[in-house]
Amino acid sequence: MILSARLSVAYGKIPNLHLRLLDAKNTSTELDSRLNILKGEKVKNMRDKWWQDAVIYQVYPKSFNDTTGSGYGDITGIIEKLPYLEKLGVDGLWLSPVYLSPQVDNGYDITDYRVIDTMFGSNEDMYRLIEAAHDKNIKIIMDFVANHTSDQCVWFQESRKGTDNFFSDFYIWQDAKPDGSEPNNWGSSFGGSAWTWDEKREQYYLHYYAAEQPDLNWENPHVRAYIYDMMRFWKQKGVDGWRMDVITSISKDQDFPDNARDLTTTNQQNGPRMHEFIHEMNQEILTPLDMMTVGESPAAKSWDAWELVSPEREELDMIFTFEHMHIDRKAGDVNGRWALQDRDLVKLKDILSNWQLELRDKGWNALYFENHDRARVISRWGNDTTYRYECATAFATILHGLQGTPFIYQGEEIGMTNPEFELGEYVDIELKGNYQHFVVEQQTMTQADFLAAVHKISRDNARTPMQWDDSENAGFTNGTPWFKVNPNYPDINVAKDLKAEKSVFKYYQELIRLRKTEDILKTGTYKLLLPEDEAIFAYLRQNGSKTWLVLANLSENMIKLEELMPLPDVKATVITNYRDRTNLSETLRAYEAVIVEI
């Protein structure tokens, strides 16, 4: 049943909402027909969805390709590069937010979900992109930010006015404690308190991220109805799926209990009604309209992920876990994610293996090392200078050999690196907030230690402009780029890599081709080898009589494999990043990767 949203105010009295108000009795005939297509059906078959055969490419539009000289990437720039993505061989294009936004958090603070920000173009440009991508058999996945909006959103502006209007409960408001302090000790992921006092309403509002990103109140059915209607709107425009930003944060404990430690974020995930809300969304929108989903789930572990992605649960198709991205983090440190240690490859193997085994036949993995929130993997965990090609292709081999849907972040396919700027050259609000919190206020980190961590893990490492060629500004813009270009662009760029003998792009092309032609990658079983080895990542994939050994030396050391394991007979070499590799008896060189049939 469609969630009713009978409203106590007229739509015409609320400016710039761009939302059709829902009512079960007056829903359009077109929508009714769509909802009836799959009514009552449950998707049980784990082998018939387009995204299970797909490789998906993420574009960060602001940094991808500028066609106007504004210094910001735009939608026309994405259309211009569709032949490049077609050449790479990807099946889906995930766009980070392009909605109307003040850009406090680079578009993850949305003012209007139905309007494209003029920074990127127009709604008509977006519709052209959808059509042009579909003409090349590339699906479009939009970013879905439903935990919070911008504080400039009309919903929030109306909500601030008082406690007795329709939008009053669209956000999470609480009275101050008797001493005027915050309702509890919850912290923001961007540093400081998760509560901000609003002088106009004379209450605190909740924000898990920036103060300019107030959290929506999913307990309010009208909020959910508005969100679902936005999803219908974009489906009608041709959007094929959603990447769901921090979707596991949408439910909050309504008792608002204190955390064990002040200003921490342990409360932010898996609230009491999370599964209920996501299931409702699935039944209202996702299943009836056949929309693919991948949800951001920071706290998910392999053993409980099935609750979100099992077809029988009718919630999401895939989730992005953060678990494997914490192998270089000091657990429990007061400095949170900025407290780093050397990468733990044994832990990485254990985590990825658990996800492979736990979700087999119960769900589907989303595979990634990089995205707009993650630093370049070769700079973070590998060698981005002497062995840049080998390192980039070795990590790619390990990831693309697993069962699941691989996600490639822009520039990953040419081996882009972290820039190592000076502290004042970074722009990310998370970085600035955490610097203030840990270095200035708590003084638990020195500026030098914080900058060293920034060079490894800051979100800005992934957000430098795409490096297309060796012309000024890496061919990204004819104007002044919104964010500094990595100075190494004359050496690392698309044009140069396409011509290189050792081309990261061409290696990715081959990995993608294998994904489309070799069923063993989709359906084969998984078995980890050498689980305690600190340099070698090796596993078997098996499908019927066919067995592949996926193997990578993720170190700069020369390693004799025969000293670690019995060497199988090799029937054929499937792919390798050292072209002279003919068998397994030879020494494995720095960041050497190979897939062989045995």
Give the ranges of each region predicted by the language model.
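Short hydrophobic targeting helices and cationic amphipathic motifs
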Residues: L3, L17-L19, S33, L38
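Hydrophobic residues within beta-strands of alpha/beta enzymes
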Residues: L93, W242-M244
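C-terminal beta-strand-rich structural cap/linker in extracellular carbohydrate-active enzymes
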Residues: N583-I598
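Beta-strand-rich binding/interaction modules
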Residues: M558-Y578
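Loop/helix patches that line or flank the sugar-binding groove of alpha-linked glycan CAZymes
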Residues: W50-W51, T266, E276-P288, M292, ...
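Acidic/aromatic-lined carbohydrate-recognition and catalytic surfaces
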Residues: K44-R232, Q236, S249-K301, L308-P311, ...
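Short hydrophobic alpha-helical segments enriched in small aliphatic residues
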Residues: A5, V9-G12, L19, A24-T27
